[in-house]
């Protein structure tokens, strides 16, 4: 099963969940009161259930156009703050830039991509997700769920090494992406694409 096939399966299940996507009127004036610039980091995980899926839709630049209540609750933002904000609003500094480089390369080629992502909530706590991001008309749809795979522990180790290389050796995102893929190959995966499928 490819990541694209997995993404289609997840999207077809969306109708089985009672989720209300909040559509953003991109012409409305949206106040961004209280957005964190550099919230302190808290070494505490935001709890959420295995049955809770996050949804968000962005334009091609990563600006949030729609989202569901689970995303708002776990990330700790109000709809007025999330609407029209860049998706990197929830990016955690522990995430290697190489992972995002791999994701964007796949998306630019028109493929769905999957990745483990550590996010930062508004209050500085963190939450891990497995994200499946797919190109849709005019942007991207991201569906995220709680990681449960045994590969999750391996991913944390790979990400820690990647982050150390980025910070200590000054690797560019592209160099880091290649090093991440090399680490995954050393762990027994043919390439990042195969890893996404098995993750």
Please tell me what each predicted stretch does.
Residues 2-18, 34-164:
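Sensory/regulatory domains in signal-transduction proteins
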Residues 10-14, 24, 171, 184:
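Extended hydrophobic/Leu-rich segments
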Residues 19-27:
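Intrinsically disordered, low-complexity N-terminal regulatory segments enriched in Ser/Pro/Thr/Gly
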Residues 26-35:
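N-terminal flexible/basic segments that precede or flank functional cores
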Residues 45, 61, 193-199:
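A broadly tuned "polar low-complexity/structure-edge" signature
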Residues 138-198:
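Sensory coupling linkers of modular signal transduction proteins
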């Amino acid at each position: 099963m490819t990541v694209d096939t997995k993404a289609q399966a997840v999207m077809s299940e969306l109708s089985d969940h009672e989720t209300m996507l909040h559509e953003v009127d991109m012409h409305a004036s949206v106040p961004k009161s209280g957005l964190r610039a550099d919230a302190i980091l808290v070494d505490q995980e935001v709890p959420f259930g295995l049955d809770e899926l996050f949804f968000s839709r962005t334009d091609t630049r990563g600006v949030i156009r729609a989202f569901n209540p689970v995303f708002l609750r776990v990330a700790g933002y109000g709809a007025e703050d999330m609407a029209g904000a860049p998706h990197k609003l929830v990016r955690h500094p522990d995430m290697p830039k190489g992972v995002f480089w791999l994701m964007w390369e796949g998306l630019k080629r028109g493929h769905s991509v999957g990745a483990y992502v550590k996010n930062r909530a508004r209050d500085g706590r963190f939450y891990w997700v497995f994200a499946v991001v797919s190109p849709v008309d005019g942007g991207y749809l991201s569906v995220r769920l709680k990681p449960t795979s045994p590969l999750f522990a391996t991913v944390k180790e790979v990400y820690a090494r990647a982050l150390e290389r980025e910070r200590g050796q000054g690797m560019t995102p592209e160099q880091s992406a290649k090093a991440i893929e090399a680490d995954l190959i050393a762990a027994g995966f043919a390439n990042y694409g195969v890893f996404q499928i098995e993750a």
